[in-house]
A protein has these predicted regions:
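Ribonuclease/tRNase effector modules and their secretory precursors
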Residues: 1-78
Length: 78
C-alpha cells in the first residue's frame, strides 16, 4: 500500500467485513488502487473501488504514521 507499512482493523470494521463477506485482501486492494479517494466525516479518509460492475466497496480509515487504521467498511450495490 502506498505509504502504509501496516494496516490495523478496528472491531467495527471487522464486524462490517464479516457482515458483507469482505476479506482483508479486498480491503487492501481498495487501499492500494482506489477508484476514488477523499475526506469522510471526522477528518477520516475514504477509498472506494468497484469490485464488479455492480458492487462498490468503501473503506473508511484514519491515517497514522506509516499505518492505516480501518474504521469501517461498506458495500454498496449500484
Amino acid at each position: 500500500m502506498p505509504g502504509f507499512q501496516r494496516v490495523t482493523f478496528l472491531p467495527h470494521a471487522r464486524e462490517r467485513m464479516e457482515q458483507y463477506g469482505i476479506d482483508e485482501e479486498e480491503v487492501r486492494s481498495v487501499l492500494e488502487a482506489p477508484g476514488e479517494e477523499g475526506t469522510a466525516n471526522f477528518s477520516r479518509s475514504y477509498a472506494q473501488k468497484l469490485l464488479s460492475s455492480r458492487l462498490l466497496v468503501r473503506v473508511i480509515y484514519n491515517v497514522g504514521v506509516d499505518e492505516a487504521v480501518i474504521v469501517s467498511v461498506m458495500l454498496r450495490r449500484r
